């Protein structure tokens, strides 16, 4: 298992992207809309990991609810796993509360699933199937 990316919820990609581009000394490596999660994301490769900026595309998206509750900032930590479906079964059997019981498509068309913060010390954890 390794760190895949850190997700940061922002009110506006147009406002946040230039700040991160200046800080990182590079443009975003990718930008896309993830319809299922109702977000627009900009991804920056940083060493062996990534920073993902998330902007809600709908007021009822998880990112919009997160910003309304906690403001902009850390949204989730994503970890790469080899067998996502197997890891979800293992964690559920161990009593970890899952948001997603089955993998779904996320940014970059990767298979992802989220663990509930109630089981992970208050941090939203995303598991990403390692390619």
Give, region by region, the residue ranges found by the protein language model.
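Long, hydrophobic N-terminal alpha-helical segment
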Residues: 1-37, 61
């Amino acid at each position: 298992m390794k760190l895949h990316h850190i997700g940061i919820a922002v009110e506006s990609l147009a406002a946040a992207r230039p700040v991160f581009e200046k800080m990182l000394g590079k443009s975003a490596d990718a930008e896309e809309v993830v319809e299922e999660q109702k977000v627009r994301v900009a991804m920056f490769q940083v060493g062996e990991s990534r920073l993902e900026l998330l902007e809600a595309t709908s007021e009822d998206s998880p990112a919009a609810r997160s910003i309304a509750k906690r403001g902009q900032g850390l949204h989730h930590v994503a970890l790469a796993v080899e067998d996502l479906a197997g890891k979800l079964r293992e964690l559920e059997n161990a009593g970890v509360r899952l948001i997603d019981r089955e993998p779904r498509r996320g940014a970059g068309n990767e298979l992802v699933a989220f663990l509930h913060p109630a089981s992970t010390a208050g941090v939203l954890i995303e598991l990403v199937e390692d390619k």
